[in-house]
Amino acid sequence: MNEIKRFQIRGVPGDVKRVQFGSRTVDYWLPKQSATHLLIAHDGQNVFDGTTSTHRHQTWKMAQSALRVSEALGINPPAIIGVWHSQSKENPWGRGKDLVPARYFREGLEVHKDFADILIADQLESDQYLATIFNEIVPAIAPNIAPTNTAMIGSSMGGLATLYALGENPEKFFTALALSPHWPFAGNELVEETISSLPEPGQHKIWMSHGTKGLDSAYAPFQIYADKLLRTRGYQGHDFVSKVYNRSGHNERSWAKYLDQPMRFWLAS
């Protein structure tokens, strides 16, 4: 782990550190109080730093949300790790390679024709990406936080990656926060594969949500199906929440506006 820089966020105590694990960039923030919870976030470019975010100066404001919610609950704030995707001019589809569930497509799931030129099964790298997170990044930054107190969060492709990670690594974290999961990549077949791969209910918690504007406007039929399948599997009550946010879109500003709710869903348990 090589440190690149440190920077501060208004209203957030301490520094955010930017480090490198091989070619993978990571931003992370540790609260001044000893953290007992850990949040792992995809698309780390958008978590803390408005100068690196997809939409200029639009971030998740994740540390601010964590501080608000933890103070209201009377607990120490969680540590937050933001893992950058690898998209660049040289690797224009790097984000998709990192986040799209590799095993499903390697085993024959057919991608929607609109994405066939982008998603090539043998080029997907999500398994290697997740291995780096769990075997290198987390042990180096937050080695003493229990998996039972660890959550993962992502939006769009990051939402898919979060659910995939829970199915593939259920012993590594116990709460999945999937905002605006991008089901249209493969439609109901992707929904079925994802839900059937999740661990048996009883120990894990799952949050899913979407808006009604932009890309999110197409998600409702798939999410309704996902909700039905998940409840059929036995996820219910405090273990599963699915929300629709009217007039909410597909961008960091929209997700940040309601982030306190999934944050509380996780931390209040």
Where are these regions (language model features)?
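Non-catalytic cap/lid and distal C-terminal segments of serine-dependent acyl enzymes
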Residues: M1-S269
